Amino acid sequence: MGSIKRVRNILAAAACLALPAAARAQYETPVNPPDPAAQLAEMVALYDSVCLRAFPNDEAAARDMTARGAVPMSDAEVRSLLRDDPGRGWNVAGRTARFRVTIEGPPFHACGVRTMAAAAFPDMAPYRALAARFEAGGAYRSFGPQSMVVDNVDSTAAGERRDDRGRTESLMVFLGTPVAKLRDAAHSAVEIRFVHQIYAPH
């Protein structure tokens, strides 16, 4: 039971600290959505570089963003995503879509990449292959899917986690869309978010 409770706490923290308010404009259904496979491939490559290779070295992640010509988020943008927790973020104008990258400070030290899409990616094999390579030999255990509602966003999360010398390291995928009462044909986009989180309690 203790392990299950820890997973729920980790998921709740990631959702509450990273999901934006359910602004209708954010979830407008794309008129000309990009090819899902191409968008996923670009997102996976960005996540691999920033969140799996550079992170948890925050300065290395920042250098990666600078090299890509990413635009730093304003304080207001960062607060809308991370609430009162310390962190920073960047907007990335990708080839297929806009991506947002955030680095959240401890104790829930996390690197996240998110994008909006017309629907959840139909084939997550490229992400699964990347996660499997990263997790190889690390005694990761799967959890989820688990659902929650935060700020009128219906969110589903799943991933893998491991306990390592008093800290918990997780790879997670979140899908968020407006709750049913706010969702209609013009506002049905899905936020897709990949998160690498390292939780080290004080």
Spans of features found by a protein language model:
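Bacterial N-terminal signal peptides
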Residues: 12-18
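Long, charged/polar, surface-exposed segments that mediate recognition or autoinhibition
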Residues: 92-158
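Bacterial N-terminal signal peptides that target proteins for export
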Residues: 2-11
